[in-house]
Curated annotation (Swiss-Prot):
Monomer. GO terms for cellular component: cytosol. It comes from Chlamydia trachomatis serovar D (strain ATCC VR-885 / DSM 19411 / UW-3/Cx). This is Methionine aminopeptidase. Disulfide bonds: none annotated.
């Protein structure tokens, strides 16, 4: 690294005017302090990582069971009741329950068709042709896991199938580039390019986020094109959860329940989510189900 190169910390200053002579291969304690002070990002310790890994696996197992139970004729309230049973079985706490203002009333989010995210379970049976995102967030021994998946009910339309596939493809494409020192904005670039292949749009009202010690931490991970140059570092844990719309990217919040976000043109939306750890050589998908 040369003195006139941009500093590895993402400050947009030259290395000689910033962290010179400290190189990117810096001691982990220094890295942890730097990211806490500069970005308010928690670089997790090995002990924290192990506990977050456990929370993420519990979260993934609960999500898998809920997706298996999501069938035509089942209500999302019934899925919420199953979620409560599964959380108890795993000695886990559902993070969404009573979270926020107004308090979220259920243990999971179930977002159908044109609902972008934060759908509230209800007594309406699932119908043939529905697509649904189930979002599960668990607290296990004080640490958090977070992931979501799309479910297709019966025979769905070609456009609904495509938007589900596009969201998953965008998530996997973003994960494939993750490594230390990658600028955060590269994630949004990859996702935008993936959505554009299908002629779809990327929601920019909601973002991924740091997770593990808290439910929502820094950094906020934009899925659209942006200019965030924070470099990824080993020990960072965050979600990537691209929300892809068939039509326009804009959505609106339900004026009655103040939670559900819907597409403004009532076109379908899809989302997949994983929690990911940045490692020394790449990344680990913590919510990838280990059966």
């Amino acid at each position: 690294m040369k003195r006139n190169d941009p500093c590895w910390c993402g400050s947009n200053k030259k290395w000689k005017h910033c962290h010179y002579p400290t190189k990117p291969e810096r001691p982990l304690d220094n890295l942890r302090q730097l990211y806490a002070s500069r970005y308010d990002i928690i670089i997790k310790t090995p002990e924290q990582i192990e506990k977050i890994r456990k929370a993420c696996q519990v979260t993934a197992h609960i999500l898998d069971a809920l997706c298996e139970a999501a069938k035509e004729g089942v209500t999302t309230n019934e899925l919420d009741l199953l979620s409560r049973e599964l959380h108890k079985r795993h000695n886990a706490i559902p993070a969404p329950l009573n979270y926020g203002h107004p308090p979220f009333p259920k243990t999971i989010c179930t977002s159908l068709n044109e609902v972008i995210c934060h759908g509230i379970p209800n007594d309406i049976p699932l119908q043939n042709g529905d697509i649904m995102n189930i979002d599960v967030s668990c607290i296990v021994d004080g640490f958090y896991g977070d992931c979501s998946r799309m479910v297709m009910i019966g025979e769905v339309s070609e456009i609904k199938r495509k938007v589900c596939e596009a969201s998953l493809e965008a998530l996997n494409a973003a994960i494939s580039i993750l490594e230390p020192n990658l600028p955060l904005y590269e994630i949004g670039e990859v996702i935008e390019n993936c959505a554009a292949k299908y002629g779809f749009s990327v929601v920019d009202q909601f973002v991924g986020h740091g997770v593990g010690v808290k439910f929502h931490e820094n950094p906020f991970v934009a899925h659209h094109r942006n200019s965030c140059k924070i470099p990824l570092a080993p020990g960072m844990i965050f979600t990537i959860e691209p929300m892809i719309n068939v039509g326009k990217k804009e959505g609106f919040i339900d004026p009655i329940n103040h939670w559900e976000a819907r597409t403004c043109d009532h076109q379908p939306s899809a989302q997949w989510e994983h929690a990911i750890l940045i490692t020394d050589s790449g990344c680990e998908v913590l919510t990838l189900l280990d059966k």
